[in-house]
């Protein structure tokens, strides 16, 4: 599935844009503040319902406008799909697919699996566990049809349980929540464990190509003790949870530990090496999806040249081309991406929110 056309209206500093896109590489070149990252963010928002630079909707809608409008056309092997997303200042969204309203953002996410690589993406490696849980959950979402519903229900039950912890005095009063919570927690943890085990070889192979000087290891931590039933953990920790007023153990505390030569990667790797590792993990995840389902990812890469020397940029470019996926790359100068260009790619110039090809 590739995005063949993108319409943007009142998004960030872009008043209006109508872009015919390449199914291969699409380059967005412009000075800082020109709007090239806004194009990437518009694509991301079309597939996620939210921007990646700001959670405040008022900052995403163009100044003095009431809403942004995004439309796209997705070309699959057998059919074309029209998609649209409108969001106003109150945060109300409208999702349209093939001319019909009432759809969910999760449907857009399923139609447009994408990988985002930005200068801020180091949080996957040096940020809290929630970023690595999101990495695993992306894979589970695209691999397990029931994952999103289970994950949504888990979040709801945890919120209710945490609220109840402020009011109850005996564990028996929590059993109605835990009766629902326990099977969901165990199922989600099983899916995450299976996914991390399935993708482990892909991650190791790709990381070895990008960072041959290190031995990288990956271990999934489910969020509570090994060999212990979740029901036992919840009951045993009731008094502590009640004092904390939140549930201290469970799938919401899971992590994917990543080590280089036995040490945490954030303590061992340079910024350039961390970016290479981040790129390797995103590539491995996209390639794993393609092998498992036949679906290709869409890759968004902001500020391609930062932190990478010519050799590493060339390696990343060759691996991206090998995926045969659609790729969007922003850069300050065309010189940084000209070597990646071929007869099928498109080069867009971005200046003060205006986009030309």
Curated annotation (Swiss-Prot):
Gene Ontology biological process terms in this record: DNA replication; DNA synthesis involved in DNA repair; double-strand break repair; SOS response
Annotated Gene Ontology cellular component terms: cytoplasm
Gene3D superfamilies, sorted: P-loop containing nucleotide triphosphate hydrolases, RecF/RecN/SMC, N-terminal domain
Major subcellular site: cytoplasm
Location in the cell: Cytoplasm
Binding site for ATP: 30-37
InterPro entries: DNA-binding_RecF (IPR001238), DNA-binding_RecF_CS (IPR018078), P-loop_NTPase (IPR027417), RecF/RecN/SMC_N (IPR003395), RecF_2 (IPR042174)
Top-level taxon of origin: Bacteria
UniProt keywords, alphabetically: ATP-binding, Cytoplasm, DNA damage, DNA repair, DNA replication, DNA-binding, Nucleotide-binding, SOS response
Molecular function as annotated in GO: ATP binding; single-stranded DNA binding
Function: The RecF protein is involved in DNA metabolism; it is required for DNA replication and normal SOS inducibility. RecF binds preferentially to single-stranded, linear DNA. It also seems to bind ATP.
Similarity-based family: Belongs to the RecF family.
NCBIfam families according to UniProt: recf
Name of the featured protein: DNA replication and repair protein RecF
Species, as recorded: Escherichia fergusonii (strain ATCC 35469 / DSM 13698 / CCUG 18766 / IAM 14443 / JCM 21226 / LMG 7866 / NBRC 102419 / NCTC 12128 / CDC 0568-73)
Gene name tied to this protein: recF
